[in-house]
């Protein structure tokens, strides 16, 4: 971050950073209140494809997070924008709870494949239908390619391995719309009036959250909650600006050293 520029915006990952399923990270609500007590703009960015933005917002409010819908930017939003730009009819491999975010999108006689995290759809018959569409020239759109994510019972496969399987089988390359894509972070910052060099990203994924943000010029703070595993910070170059225990510790650092 350029020394002459003050911090103006903080982007915060949700799952694994503020909460894990229906449990908040300890101290996260109070830390968010402290961050909001400053002059920085706060936005929430997520690759979740398991639920619509409205369902996600309701989950966060039940956990007593003070968040409004217009502060959340999701990879589902980015995927819908791309579908509208391309004017294609997608085969939607997403969780049924995410379908409201695609309301109005024509899906009959599909000529594109959209993949999110949808364990109930990831079986041979459905994946083979997607495979055949791709062989016929349909574009493959990956909402994100996370390798795994954190559940209460442990780590679980993300959509990335399934996207990669279809890429391999069809000799094609998916268009990825979520983190760590540069366009995702730039779109999340749009409307804040902030440049990437004036922003910080806080997340539990060293590649998708921290690496992606730092690639566009932001500072990246990696938290050791959610999907974090020992030595994750050594997997990207440059390494995270900071690695700390949790979101409250990240906020402490911001308040003490970046404002």
Curated annotation (Swiss-Prot):
Q: How is the cofactor bound?
A: Binds 1 Mg(2+) ion per subunit.
Residue positions, PTM N6-succinyllysine: 50
Q: Which keywords are on file for this protein?
A: Coiled coil, Magnesium, Metal-binding
Q: Which GO terms describe its molecular function?
A: enzyme binding; metal ion binding; phosphatase activity
Disulfide bond positions: none
**A GO CC annotation given for this chain:** cytoplasm
Residues that bind Mg(2+), according to the entry? 13, 15, 204
Q: Does the keyword Ribosomal protein apply?
A: no
Domain of life, per UniProt, equals: Eukaryota
| Cofactors, names only | Mg(2+)
Taken from the record, one Pfam family name reads: Hydrolase_6
The family database entries (InterPro entries) matched by this protein are listed as: HAD-like_sf, HAD-SF_hydro_IIA, HAD_sf, LHPP/HDHD2
Question: What CDD domains has UniProt attached to this entry?
Answer: HAD_PPase
Q: Where is coiled-coil annotated? A: 47-71
Annotated residues that bind substrate are located at 13-15, 46-47, 179
Q: Which NCBIfam families match?
A: HAD-SF-IIA, HAD-SF-IIA-hyp3
> So what family is this one in?
Belongs to the HAD-like hydrolase superfamily.
Task: Please give the name of this protein.
Answer: Haloacid dehalogenase-like hydrolase domain-containing protein 2
- What gene, per UniProt, encodes this protein? HDHD2
